């Protein structure tokens, strides 16, 4: 609706849908197994910070194939954050960008469709893979249980503590790096400051018992 009729009402609806989906993502991001691992779902869905210059090139070139690893930072929830909140400095200016340049709307659709298609692949595969996964409890490197455990530990240390908290807060540098948070553009341009909300949901998604053992 927004691409066909960009105004403040459809813009707000788009923002709210993006935020709801991004919050939900926090609860599944650590499960990088099966089809998700095969298609690099984690990287395609939540690589940040985005590559602004490459996104603009993709827009101008009307690019529709985002399978190149160099385009991981041009799609997913961070890519949508830029397209919804970052191509100008205010809601009205952003809406005008879509009115004046239809290529922005075309690329927004490409990013949304890519995310939806990848999600469908993972969900459809899970419907057939679930029983195999549940019954795979052997103590081997390729058993589902061990893979799940290893992926969870990796996510906890790298995806959560390092990427979501450590790097933006400046733990690994002399100063905080605010541009390396999730939802950077929504917060930066005053649309809605949701970066903290995403981190809090990511922490809530981590099982308290596992957190106690891993910290």
Regions inferred by a protein language model and the residue ranges of each:
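N-terminal secretory/targeting leader peptides
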Residues: 8-11
């Amino acid at each position: 609706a927004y691409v066909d009729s960009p105004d403040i009402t459809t813009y707000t609806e788009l923002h709210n849908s993006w935020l709801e989906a991004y919050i939900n993502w926090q609860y599944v991001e650590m499960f990088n197994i099966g089809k998700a691992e095969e298609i690099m779902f984690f990287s395609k869905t939540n690589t940040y910070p985005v590559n602004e210059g490459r996104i603009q090139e993709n827009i101008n070139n009307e690019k529709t194939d985002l399978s190149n690893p160099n385009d991981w930072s041009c799609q997913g929830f961070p890519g949508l954050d830029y397209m919804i909140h970052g191509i100008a400095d205010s809601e009205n200016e952003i809406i005008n960008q879509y009115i004046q340049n239809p290529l922005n709307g075309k690329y927004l659709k490409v990013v949304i469709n890519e995310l939806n298609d990848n999600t469908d692949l993972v969900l459809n595969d899970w419907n057939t893979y679930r029983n195999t996964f549940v019954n795979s409890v052997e103590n081997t490197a390729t058993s589902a249980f061990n893979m799940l455990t290893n992926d969870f530990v990796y996510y906890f240390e790298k995806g959560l503590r390092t990427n979501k908290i450590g790097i933006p807060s400046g733990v690994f540098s002399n100063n905080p790096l605010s541009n390396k948070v999730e939802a950077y553009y929504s917060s930066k341009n005053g649309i809605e400051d949701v970066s903290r909300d995403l981190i809090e949901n990511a922490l809530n998604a981590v099982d308290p018992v596992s957190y106690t053992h891993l910290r």
